[in-house]
Amino acid sequence: MTITQMQYFSMVCQFQSISKAAEQLFVSQPALSASLLDLEKEIGFRLFERRSRGVVTTEEGRLLLQHVDSVLKRYNLLMRSLPELAEHQNILHVGFRPTSGENEFFSLFKKYRQVQP
């Protein structure tokens, strides 16, 4: 199961409609339906009962949705934190008093640059 499939599944559960979910996800209805069918084959049970006016989540689908929503929340948190992590990449913060630490700083900085070019 991919993150994309989880997002698709969650959105269809939210709207109880493959067409409305497809519209919100900016994918075609046939592509979304195919992805859901692939997911059902992979996990071995039906997620939805198809009806003339949309879909109804099965009992198994409701149980799976709890786990999927938990994973998606963590995934979204991770994605939001990536820019912050990238900003701190390879940054060394150093503080010293100019009158007493200058010589020590340059000696340590030289050693640091040998280890971390």
What are these regions (language model features)?
Residues 2-8, 29, 61, 68:
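The N-cap/first-turn positions of alpha helices
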Residues 30, 77, 87-116:
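N-terminal winged-helix
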